[in-house]
Amino acid sequence: MAEGEESKKMNLQTSYFDVVGICCSSEVSIVGNVLRQVDGVKEFSVIVPSRTVIVVHDTFLISPLQIVKALNQARLEASVRPYGETSLKSQWPSPFAIVSGVLLVLSFFKYFYSPLEWLAIVAVVAGVFPILAKAVASVTRFRLDINALTLIAVIATLCMQDFTEAATIVFLFSVADWLESSAAHKASIVMSSLMSLAPRKAVIADTGLEVDVDEVGINTVVSVKAGESIPIDGVVVDGSCDVDEKTLTGESFPVSKQRESTVMAATINLNGYIKVKTTALARDCVVAKMTKLVEEAQKSQTKTQRFIDKCSRYYTPAVVVSAACFAVIPVLLKVQDLSHWFHLALVVLVSGCPCGLILSTPVATFCALTKAATSGFLIKTGDCLETLAKIKIVAFDKTGTITKAEFMVSDFRSLSPSINLHKLLYWVSSIECKSSHPMAAALIDYARSVSVEPKPDIVENFQNFPGEGVYGRIDGQDIYIGNKRIAQRAGCLTDNVPDIEATMKRGKTIGYIYMGAKLTGSFNLLDGCRYGVAQALKELKS
């Protein structure tokens, strides 16, 4: 009982942090050491390529800003990531890098005015502070990272009085760090776009109050208007509509929803008004589970990555020993041109940093997983990517993978001798201009492609019938457009629809046009193949 009461008092929240100080997997243990000492942190995970730390914490005990403070005490440069941030903000280099670069360029004019040579030293001082701070933090944790190795190289270069070269090392390292941070930021945007699929607010049907989805419990009835995203998984208890489920299923054709129909968060109500009784909490919805799967896949390590991480423990000391040998052995052997050997030692020290080796595999894996996620593919782990090299048979889902998941009109015909094709297409496209259905967009585009310009202003009494079609009065005619069920609403008593369907090819969606109770036209919609699919399948077979 005591344990149950304690869990009720907790208010767990998942927060996302951008941690610029994570340059490779060796910093994961540093993050772990910091967060394990923080009271209120229940669990955490680190995604190295995007420099993301995900923390589940009790907000009664610790806030996201306090977690940031704890991480920054270890010089990890952490910040709270706004929920669902999807806009790519332009990131400028740090002021240290900019000032260092300007002074370095000015120092190159020393050949015209020799005192400008000293600007190189000022460039080192201006740009070395971030490197120095991170290097000190690394050494105090008994670790040698790229910042410590670079700082040693800069100090040694200054001792050799190669001021311009020292400034160049500082500037190039700062620029490289900025480019890496920008790449990590772009990667994190992908994860944020998945998080933002579902809305963060829901409207309670009984009161009309708008609340956070995290506050909505199970069996709560929420209302969803036309054009809005469904906030939480549930069952329709009132109303009807067509729902676009393309974000989750990849299927381009909207699904009709009636009473007792199941709906999912992040899908879009295209028309109609519905009330939904929730069947899950926001954190347990399908879209939340999908995001969780992607996070787990990004955190998982491939066999190659685990092997590289294991080797990297011994790689850094080996680099330092190798650099020391290049510097010390020539001195012991009393060889000439010692400055050349010192220079080689510095090259080994800087270029031999393990960060590039450690990051190579996880970055490639991360890019593959995130690109797949945004394209509609969920890959369980990084090991699955390595397994792809050994597969013999591939099975593809058609919609959204082989096809574009967008409708296009493949056939449009008039079934009445008294109504020509252009006249019928003019009526249909004008009425469909008032509809938000994906089928409407395809018909409008088709009309314009054959030089028929729709005029929605002349359409009267437009009505939408979810799961059936639409109605509009134009030029004195009552026009019904939709699927087979629209016939009954149009007053058609003869069952001539199956005869038309028998002439259609499989894989096409069939639409019907009624003028009053008379069937006057039909059209076919299909989901066209993606560009390059045939070539891709041919290459896979080869």
From Swiss-Prot:
Parts of the chain on the Cytoplasmic side: 1-89, 135-141, 185-310, 360-542
Membrane topology: Multi-pass membrane protein
An example molecular function term from Gene Ontology annotations: ATP binding
GO cellular component terms attached to this protein's record: vacuolar membrane
Classification via PROSITE patterns: ATPASE_E1_E2 (PS00154), HMA_2 (PS50846)
Extracellular topological domain residue ranges: 112-114, 163, 334-341
Gene3D superfamilies: 3.30.70.100, Calcium-transporting ATPase, cytoplasmic domain N (3.40.1110.10), Calcium-transporting ATPase, cytoplasmic transduction domain A (2.70.150.10), HAD superfamily/HAD-like (3.40.50.1000)
Compartments where located: Membrane
GO biological process: detoxification of cadmium ion
PANTHER family linked: CADMIUM/ZINC-TRANSPORTING ATPASE HMA2-RELATED (PTHR48085), INACTIVE CADMIUM_ZINC-TRANSPORTING ATPASE HMA3-RELATED (PTHR48085:SF6)
Family in the record: Belongs to the cation transport ATPase (P-type) (TC 3.A.3) family. Type IB subfamily.
The protein's name: Putative inactive cadmium/zinc-transporting ATPase HMA3
Organism per entry: Arabidopsis thaliana (Mouse-ear cress)
